Amino acid sequence: MKEASYTKKRCRLGRLLFGLILLWFIAGCGYHVVGGGEDNIAPGIQSVFVDSFINKTSEAGLESLFRNAFIDQVLRGGRFQLAGRREEADAIIRGNIKSMNTSHLSYQATDLAAEERLSVVMEVTFEERVSKKVIWQDRNFSYNGDYPVTSGSLTATQVERKDALTKLSNDVAERAYSLMLSGF
């Protein structure tokens, strides 16, 4: 009886020891998430100016839509003050909208589009104003947004597309801002 109790205690001790060694190994293996949020941005960068975006597409007004989305994101993010003029800023966000495409995503039984996808490709740069040092940049930042096509109503489809463009610009700004802060 004593031998069975001794074996159980030894087995428990072995499991505990194995668990502690495993925990120690995992904690000490150097595994960690890359990019630490705001720590990637120099503390001296407190104000940001969102420069006018360049629009190389045939879609009128995209530059204003995306610039406004980035301005809203800087205000929502809370990490930076929004500078009213370039000269007042520590850093600048610039954007260059390279392309905007619309493609059919799904079809109705009558072979008409039921849903369409907007795809944008743009260059986004976050740089120090004075030194022009690039803090973060993605030359081919791409994002998609979907919207339903209302059969028989061009006006309803246009409203859906406009709403999808607004959502797409906000999603792009949010994602790019997050990547800027994390250093990815």
Positions of predicted regions on the chain:
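Bacterial N-terminal signal peptides
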Residues: 16-28
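Surface-exposed loop/turn and secondary-structure junction residues enriched for glycine/proline
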Residues: 4, 34-37, 44, 48, ...
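A structural "domain/chain start" motif
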Residues: 27-72, 76-87, 130, 173-174, ...
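Bacterial N-terminal signal peptides that target proteins for export
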Residues: 2-18
